[in-house]
């Protein structure tokens, strides 16, 4: 976290990717072929997913030259506490990217989010917890390999799917003006996966450090 506060490399790289992806999607969009309300949810979750992966990879990569993880392992700290600390730090980065991307998508695609902004924020935050829980575990496994940039998406994306699908469905319905009661099932699924991923990844993390 201190390294990131000094360099801001993780935040800047993730934000740069989000802005670039948003720009490409916007200029490739033909409003006569696809309605903005149909496109915006997909664009939003593509940006969240891949900017999050980039941020997760960078958050571990910047620590490699200083051997910060070795220092943590030598300290009298529970391995689970190390995981939770990394998770909270990564969650902060992901939420920051989401806080920039969500208004940008709403503005560019002319989506009115005022009426359902709080349920939408709840969906986004629940999904962020699930994605970061899994991503932090796999990023710690992949960072020390020579193909970390390739290995992290291969490991993490299959486990992202159970989180992204209900989140995208809930986002699409909320942006279409549906009632919050229509997305309560998706919210319950997100909450359930968050609990499962958080507990399982916390228990598995100490074993990944021993490899």
Task: Identify the role of each PLM range.
Residues 1-14:
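Aromatic- and glycine-rich beta-strand/loop motifs that create alpha-glucan
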Residues 4, 53-73, 87:
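Transmembrane helix boundary and interhelical loop/hinge segments in multi-pass membrane proteins
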Residues 27, 138-182, 186-189, 195, ...:
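Transmembrane helix segments
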Residues 77-106:
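Selective transmembrane-helix segments that form parts of the transport pathway or gating/packing helices
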């Amino acid at each position: 976290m201190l390294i990131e506060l000094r360099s801001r490399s993780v935040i800047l790289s993730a934000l740069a990717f989000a802005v670039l992806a948003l720009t490409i999607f916007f200029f490739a969009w033909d409003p006569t072929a696809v309605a903005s309300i149909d496109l915006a949810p997909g664009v939003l979750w593509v940006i969240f997913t891949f900017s999050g992966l980039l941020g997760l990879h960078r958050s571990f990569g910047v620590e490699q030259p200083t051997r910060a993880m070795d220092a943590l392992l030598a300290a009298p700290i529970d391995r689970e506490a190390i995981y939770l600390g990394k998770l909270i730090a990564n969650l902060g980065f992901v939420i920051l990217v989401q806080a920039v991307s969500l208004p940008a998508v709403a503005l560019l695609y002319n989506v009115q989010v005022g009426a359902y902004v709080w349920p939408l924020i709840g969906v986004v935050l629940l999904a962020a917890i699930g994605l970061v829980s899994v991503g932090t575990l796999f990023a710690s496994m992949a960072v020390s390999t020579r193909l970390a940039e390739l290995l992290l998406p291969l490991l993490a994306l299959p486990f992202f799917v159970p989180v992204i699908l209900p989140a995208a469905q809930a986002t699409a319905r909320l942006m279409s003006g549906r009632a919050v009661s229509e997305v309560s099932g998706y919210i319950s699924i997100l909450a359930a996966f968050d609990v499962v991923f958080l507990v399982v990844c916390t228990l598995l993390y100490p074993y990944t450090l021993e490899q």
